[in-house]
């Protein structure tokens, strides 16, 4: 990621971070409108998840220069998401919902920012998908061994 992209992402995040609950609410609204079947994977009370959403975005923004520090945690998170019912195709739906929520929350949205967020969120999704795949493969091996 270029220094210019990082600067744009940080500026964008600081703009929307002033109202974090609004951004999280928009994200979940966008997500469930785009994929109503995903609503069943979430608790009725979304309050705690909104906090997780905000914290996760802030963590990513802090580590944009070196996303490798997050790889192990993201892989573990991907494995957890398998247990919660997430499927590989859900990741693109989530990415697009985050981008729509950010766009709706930003007064300074443009094509460069859209591309920057797309790259950043994809960089998060890839290790999560890798972790999900490993988790599934280990489960399959255990099943084959009769566990």
Can you name each region flagged by the protein language model?
Residues 1-147:
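Globin-like tetrapyrrole-binding proteins
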């Amino acid at each position: 990621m270029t220094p210019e992209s990082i600067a744009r992402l940080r500026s964008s995040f600081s703009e929307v971070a002033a109202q974090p609950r609004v951004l999280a609410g928009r994200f979940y609204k966008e997500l469930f409108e785009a994929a109503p079947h995903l609503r069943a994977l979430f608790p009725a009370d979304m309050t705690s998840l909104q906090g997780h959403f905000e914290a996760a975005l802030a963590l990513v923004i802090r580590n944009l220069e070196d996303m490798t520090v997050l790889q192990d945690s993201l892989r573990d998170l991907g494995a957890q998401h398998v247990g919660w019912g997430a499927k590989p195709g859900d990741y693109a739906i989530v990415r697009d919902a985050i981008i729509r929520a950010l766009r709706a929350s930003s007064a300074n949205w443009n094509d460069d920012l859209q591309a920057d967020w797309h790259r950043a969120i994809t960089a998060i999704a890839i290790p999560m998908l890798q972790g999900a795949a490993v988790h599934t493969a280990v489960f399959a091996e255990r099943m084959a061994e009769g566990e």
